[in-house]
């Protein structure tokens, strides 16, 4: 997926679990443009993971074996916590 195709990335952010939508969509909407190109590629790789894995990682019930994905999970958690709740 092209890091500049925001419509397609936005669609990929829509998950099958509301809990994931609450974590991933606000991060994409508020933070994606400020990421480096490498971070955008890692974010897209994270979106390619299965929902149960994403849920577990974002809810701190484990972590990805891949260090880059782990960094992105932590970044999503940190930025979402700093920004606070947002309406989706």
From Swiss-Prot:
The keyword Isomerase does not apply. Gene3D superfamilies: Flavinator of succinate dehydrogenase (1.10.150.250). It is found in: Cytoplasm. One of its GO terms (cellular component) is cytoplasm. GO terms for biological process: respiratory chain complex II assembly; succinate metabolic process. Keywords: Chaperone, Cytoplasm. An FAD assembly protein, which accelerates covalent attachment of the cofactor into other proteins. Plays an essential role in the assembly of succinate dehydrogenase (SDH, respiratory complex II), an enzyme complex that is a component of both the tricarboxylic acid cycle and the electron transport chain, and which couples the oxidation of succinate to fumarate with the reduction of ubiquinone (coenzyme Q) to ubiquinol. Required for flavinylation (covalent attachment of FAD) of the flavoprotein subunit SdhA of SDH. This is FAD assembly factor SdhE. It comes from Escherichia coli (strain K12). The gene is sdhE.
């Amino acid at each position: 997926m092209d890091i500049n195709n925001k419509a397609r990335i936005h669609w990929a952010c829509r998950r099958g679990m509301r809990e994931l939508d609450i974590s991933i969509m606000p991060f994409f909407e508020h933070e994606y443009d400020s990421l480096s190109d490498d971070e955008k590629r890692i974010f897209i790789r994270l979106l390619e993971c299965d929902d149960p894995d994403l849920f577990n990682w974002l809810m701190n019930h484990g972590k990805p074996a891949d260090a880059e994905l782990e960094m992105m999970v932590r970044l999503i958690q940190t930025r979402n916590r700093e920004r606070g709740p947002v309406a989706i």
